[in-house]
Amino acid sequence: NLNPDDINIYRQLSGGVTSSHILHGSANTIGGQTQLIKLRWGANDQDLKFAGADPFIKFALGENVKRSSSTQGNPRFPDSRMGVDQVLMDAFQRATDYQNSLKAAGTKGTVRKDLELDALSEIMNKKRFITCHSYVQSEINAMMKVGDKYGFTVNTFTHILEGYKVADKMKAHGANVSTFSDWWNYKMEVVDAIPYNAYIMQKVGLNVAINSDDAEMARRLNQEAAKIVKYGGLTEEEVWKMVTINPAKMMHVDKQTGSIKVGKDADLVLWSDNPLSIYAKAEKTIVDGIIYFDREKDAAMRKLNQAEKARIIAKLTAAKR
């Protein structure tokens, strides 16, 4: 479930974020549902959800899947990239057989309902969309081959730090890509990462976004995008799209948000400077036309909190005497 009390919702508003795609971890090849939310601080869990957004599902490839249980002394399949590929092939074949059985049964209802296979069937019928944790070119190619065989497109490859090696193939497949700006060498499968990755994928013609994967970095995505101006020389407008309209397109909500246009949701940020500057601060963050973060009011609340804290401490100190 979503936690509407998570302080990171407010902190990300303070960094100029209006929407966020919430995903679970990457221990399983085929994971669970994801959730697109708007950062409506103070709302309950249901009201955080982005109304009308398409359903997505988290997939994962590579080291995280391979090592998720073996490090705990409980090895399990899959324990290799080939095993991960086989998990995918087996799952979608079962889903294909399941759909065929449902069609054959017609209205008789003789096929036992399977929620896992229902989700995979939604993917093949373009009713649910994949966000896939990925790094290495071999596994990216393998994932696309599974999609081609079973008639679906991987909507988004996330992290995708070897994306520059297979950008042309991902474009032909129809995928979007969401990557880090300059992360490198934090595990073995990232050793070939380069800071020009986003630039190269953009030039090939992919729809590129910058992702955070971290609550702290999520409120600094403006600075992460700015790095791509240095690494590749894209224009400021091109890199700004990587944290605005491009991710909105990936999530199929670009008709509602991601740019300033008559008829779209009033999701806006007032910056103190060029938002790509390291000196820029979000002065006001507006979601659906409502101001959810105001820097002046935030400063005033902090003063009140400090004064109240001092009063309570003084009272406790006096009581001890």
Question: What are the residue ranges of the model-derived segments?
Answer:
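Short acidic loop-to-helix transition motifs that present clustered carboxylates
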Residues: 137-139, 160-165, 245-248
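C-terminal cap of metal-dependent C-N hydrolases
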Residues: 261-305
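His/Asp/Glu-enriched, well-ordered alpha-helical/loop segment
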Residues: 129, 168-171, 175-271, 291
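Short, charged, surface-exposed secondary-structure boundary motifs
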Residues: 32, 47-49, 165-168, 186-194, ...
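Polyanionic/metal-chelating signatures
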Residues: 5-154, 281, 287, 316-320
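Catalytic beta/alpha-barrel core
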Residues: 131-135, 153-162, 182-187
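Intein/HINT protein-splicing elements and their conserved insertion hotspots or analogous self-processing inserts
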Residues: 84, 296-321
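Soluble non-cytosolic domains of exported or imported proteins
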Residues: 2-6, 78-82, 137, 192, ...
